[in-house]
Regions:
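Extreme N-terminal, non-catalytic leader segments
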Residues: 1-29
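Conserved nucleotide-sensing/catalytic segment adjacent to the nucleotide-binding pocket
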Residues: 70-116
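ATP-dependent NMP and nucleoside kinases share a basic, alpha-helical "lid"
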Residues: 118-169
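Small-molecule kinase domains that catalyze NTP-dependent phosphoryl transfer to phosphate-bearing small molecules
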Residues: 141, 171-209
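Short beta-strand-centered segment that lines the nucleotide-binding/catalytic pocket of NTP-utilizing
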Residues: 53-70
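Hydrophobic positions on the alpha1 helix immediately C-terminal to the Walker A/P-loop
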Residues: 42
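Conserved lysine of the Walker
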Residues: 39
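Walker A (P-loop) phosphate-binding loop of P-loop NTPases
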Residues: 36
Length: 209
C-alpha cells in the first residue's frame, strides 16, 4: 500500500515539475504532517522513486535547522508556544532557505547539532533544474506557505502517531516523561496549527497514512 502511495505521489510531483511555469529555479515541494505521521520515511521512499524519472532531487529536513535550547526552553512562554513559534527561526528560514531557493543555486543554512546544542553554518548547492523536497511539521504556517509550489500533507490518525512517538523518542526520558512532554508541548502546538492554519484545507495533496 505504501509503495503505491509513494509511486502515485512521485508521478504527481513529477508532472508538476515538468509543467512548472518557472524553469529557472527548482520546484519547491513541502512534505507536511504532524509528529509521527511518517514524513521522514515517506520522503526517503519518494526520493528513491524519483530515480525512475532521472530527476535531480534536493532534500531539507526542518528538524536539522532548529535553534539552540536556550531560545526555545524556559523562555517564559507556555511550552506549546515555544514549540510552535520558537523552535525554528521563522524569519531566518525565509531569509536563508526559502527565498534563496527562488533566486540562486545555493543556500547558506544553520545546522543544529543536537548532542552539542550548537549551530554550524554550511553551504548547500542546489540545481535549478531539480525538485527540492522540504520535510517538516508546520510547513504551511502563514509565513512559509507562499514559498512552496506544492504541499503534500501526510494525514495519520492520532492514535497511530501517539504510539509511534511515545515508543520512539527515548531521548526525552522514560515513558511517563515522554507522555508529559508530548501532552504539554508537542500535541498542544499541533492542535494550534490544525485550528489556526487548517493544513488539510491548505495542502495541494492529502495522503492518508
Amino acid at each position: 500500500m505504501m509503495n503505491r502511495k509513494v509511486e502515485e505521489t512521485a508521478e504527481t510531483l513529477y508532472s508538476q515539475y515538468k509543467n512548472r511555469s518557472n524553469k529557472n529555479r527548482p520546484l519547491l515541494i513541502g512534505i507536511d504532517g504532524l509528529g509521527g505521521a511518517g514524513k521522514t520515511s515517506f520522503i526517503k521512499e519518494l526520493s528513491r522513486e524519483f530515480k525512475n524519472f532521472n530527476c535531480e532531487i534536493g532534500m531539507f529536513h526542518l528538524d536539522d535547522h532548529i535553534v539552540e535550547k536556550n531560545k526555545r526552553y524556559r523562555t517564559g512562554y507556555e511550552e506549546w508556544y515555544e514549540y510552535y513559534y520558537l523552535q525554528w527561526d521563522i524569519e531566518g528560514l525565509i531569509t536563508n532557505l526559502l527565498e534563496p531557493l527562488h533566486k540562486q543555486n545555493h543556500v547558506i543554512l544553520p545546522f543544529y547539532n543536537k548532542s552539542a546544542d550548537l549551530i554550524s553554518t554550511r553551504q548547500v548547492d542546489v540545481l535549478k533544474d531539480s525538485i527540492v523536497l522540504i520535510e517538516g511539521i508546520f510547513l504551511q504556517r502563514k509565513e512559509w506557505r507562499y514559498y512552496f509550489d506544492y504541499v503534500v500533507f501526510l494525514n495519520c490518525p492520532f492514535e497511530v502517531r501517539r504510539d509511534r512517538v511515545l515508543h520512539r523518542d527515548s531521548y526525552l526520558g522514560d515513558y511517563q516523561a515522554r507522555l508529559k512532554k508530548y501532552t504539554e508541548r508537542y500535541w498542544l502546538g499541533e492542535q494550534h496549527y490544525m485550528e489556526t492554519v487548517q493544513p488539510l484545507t491548505a495542502a495541494d495533496l492529502i495522503i492518508t497514512m
